[in-house]
Amino acid sequence: MRSPQSLRNGETPSPSPRPPRFPTPHFHSTVSLQKLKRFNLLILVFRLSTFCFSLASSVFMLTNPTWYHFDAFRYVFAANAIVAIYSLFEMAASVWEISRGNTLFPEILQVWFDFGHDQVFAYLLLSADSAATALAKTLKGGDTCAASNAFCVQSYIAIALGFAGFLFLGLSSLLSGFRVVCFLINGSRFYV
């Protein structure tokens, strides 16, 4: 066996390989990877449903004649439009996570961002739709709905779609809360 050549003229040995800049992912079995993919797809489906219902509610309220004369209906439009935009962003973040295997933001920030915003926007939708329901009930008792039945029906549809958006955002919030708990217990958003 040949001996290694000694260093000549004060050369220094080559540096040892550097550790990776990003931490290596945890080992997961094939079954756990499938569970994670299903979990992330379920979140994506809930976010897509929230987006569809909130966008539809905003469109129904926007096309409703004279909706802007009532504060509660303006609140429904604004809340559903905000939630639709937020859901669109969260869908993009979910697709990123499914395709790339990591989060858009650092993991701790992403977990708390999702949970906190899901909570805030769910309560925003619930309060807007509750206020609009009270106004719609008042208008039904008055002569507004007798004069323009289409206005009231379209308002009812927009409010119902807003409540459906709240339902799916609430389910997303439950899954986000589960991820927060997993992060607090395991130090990772994964539950396996």
UniProtKB/Swiss-Prot annotation:
Is Cell membrane a UniProt keyword of this protein? yes
> Which residues lie in Pro residues bias regions?
14-23
Q: Where is the composition biased (Polar residues)?
A: 1-11
Residues annotated as coiled-coil are none
Q: Which residues lie on this side of the membrane: Extracellular?
A: 62-75, 129-156
Instruction: List the InterPro entries hit by this protein, alphabetically.
Output: CASP_dom
An example Gene Ontology CC term for this record:
plasma membrane
**Keywords of this entry:** Cell membrane, Membrane, Transmembrane, Transmembrane helix
Describe the subunit structure. Answer: Homodimer and heterodimers.
**In its UniProt entry, what is this protein called?**
CASP-like protein 4C1
